[in-house]
From Swiss-Prot:
Top class in the EC scheme: transferase
EC number(s) stated in the UniProt entry for this protein: 2.8.1.6
SUPFAM superfamilies per record: Radical SAM enzymes
Protein name, per record: Biotin synthase
Cofactors demanded by this protein: [4Fe-4S] cluster; [2Fe-2S] cluster
Amino acid sequence: MQEIFLCSISNVRSGDCKEDCAYCTQSSHHQGAIKRYKFKDEKVVLQEARALRELGALGFCLVTSGRELDDEKCEYIAKLAKAINQEELGLHLIACCGRADLDQLEFLRDAGIHSYNHNLETSQNFFPKICSTHTWEERFITCENALRAGLGLCSGGIFGLNESWEDRIEMLRALASLSPHTTPINFFIKNPVLPIDAETLSADEALECVLLAKEFLPNARLMAAGGREVVFKDNDKKEAKLFEYGINAVVLGDYLTTKGKAPKKDIERLLSYGLKMAASCH
């Protein structure tokens, strides 16, 4: 029976990002109707961690909006990591805080963070079409820094941004050179406040993307992330194929600014596919 790893997200700092990423509603350039706050209260984050662990989540990702880590964010994430680890929940803690240098990542590692998430998003060639305020190369360097710091690397991308199949191949080839332990696979969902005018991928094309990712990243944990709930909707037959084609992890619950599937119903559906929820990250 195939094991599926469940990971959950806490958006601990939301909105007001100065970057102009064309796919992200947290950018202040797009004026999306989202909640904006600086730092989520520690008690709320702990409640989320307990509740999601009880549902079976093994990974818990602390996400901050903004271009990069700074001293204030480092201290805040370190404080959250220590508090969560003191609960002895057995959660694998991931930080996702933008561009980061080696010293910052070593600081988070020593505070109890286990992995760092920083997505390449797309190919080096296509990236300037979706962001002008930082470079693809900066993203790649941060991924290298995470590995140098001894953290697990979680890095993936978004399919459906109007990129070509060659762009998809180039992104996956770059990811393969990093050997991430986990690769989130996101499917872009059109939003009227965002400048990208792209139709949602069909379930069949999304499955082709998963097959391609598996070909380039045979040893990575492929995680179905944003967009799964829209691309596959209630199409159980095609959603089940995700796991036949290489997906072995999913994001449980909500994303950064969009609703995911209801966790309990999502788990019931996964079980109906003949999948088993993993009991350990190792």
